[in-house]
Amino acid sequence: MMLPNFGEAAQKRLKSATVLVTGVGGLGGTAALYLAVAGVGRLILVRGGDLRLDDMNRQVLMTDDWVGKPRVFKAKETLQAINPDIQIETIHDYITSENVDSLVQSADMALDCAHNFTERDLLNSACVRWRKPMVEAAMDGMEAYLTTIIPGVTPCLSCIFPEKPDWDRRGFSVLGAVSGTLACLTALEAIKLITGFSQPLLSQLLTIDLNRMEFAKRRLYRDRSCPVCGNDAPWRYAQSNSMETSSNCTHS
């Protein structure tokens, strides 16, 4: 590939990496697609529930005949048709307190594309506990948000949102082009983390207003009293202080 700082070593890092993707929809599914075509060796796709017709405006991995069926299985089928060499594990379930630790331990990093804060908080806490990087991506309407979390280095999700925003169980409105835009940036952050070829978005929140096509970055700071990643957080005692971020992810 003729891209500065992206050579054979970077491609090998992608091949040896395992990425956990939560929420295989317009955001997570599209991000998974770009990781698959980039050459990531293994994906763990996590999403409960079945595909609905009103999901289809943003589902690039799905087909109409799959409505009413578990989307993770169709996602695997589509991704492996595009990249037959990729390994894909499918979990037809949501992120729960029972499964989150084993899932995070099985991956080198996570993409948080879940559709509610309950799952997001569980994933954030587990990534902090096990020192796994996480790309945090969210959207609502024509707005999108992105940051990359490195436990012990950057603020975690709980630092950024100590009080959780209201969540409408009916879901939220979004155009497929919005979720696709954010998904590409999410996949790019993951590729940066895995390969180290470029600086990821650390301790900064990228906000995107796609109505006005305005992109802005806001500096983020760790909360030393954060119950998840702060100085007195339980993970500091549950895990060895010498634990390092996965060798398959690199950052400066």
Curated annotation (Swiss-Prot):
<keyword id="KW-0535">Nitrogen fixation</keyword>
<protein>
    <recommendedName>
        <fullName>Protein HesA</fullName>
    </recommendedName>
</protein>
<dbReference type="GO" id="GO:0004792">
    <property type="term" value="F:thiosulfate-cyanide sulfurtransferase activity"/>
</dbReference>
<dbReference type="Pfam" id="PF00899">
    <property type="entry name" value="ThiF"/>
</dbReference>
<comment type="function">
    <text>May be required for efficient nitrogen fixation.</text>
</comment>
<dbReference type="GO" id="GO:0005737">
    <property type="term" value="C:cytoplasm"/>
</dbReference>
<dbReference type="InterPro" id="IPR000594">
    <property type="entry name" value="ThiF_NAD_FAD-bd"/>
</dbReference>
<dbReference type="InterPro" id="IPR045886">
    <property type="entry name" value="ThiF/MoeB/HesA"/>
</dbReference>
<dbReference type="InterPro" id="IPR035985">
    <property type="entry name" value="Ubiquitin-activating_enz"/>
</dbReference>
<dbReference type="GO" id="GO:0016779">
    <property type="term" value="F:nucleotidyltransferase activity"/>
</dbReference>
<dbReference type="GO" id="GO:0009399">
    <property type="term" value="P:nitrogen fixation"/>
</dbReference>
<comment type="similarity">
    <text>Belongs to the HesA/MoeB/ThiF family.</text>
</comment>
<dbReference type="GO" id="GO:0008641">
    <property type="term" value="F:ubiquitin-like modifier activating enzyme activity"/>
</dbReference>
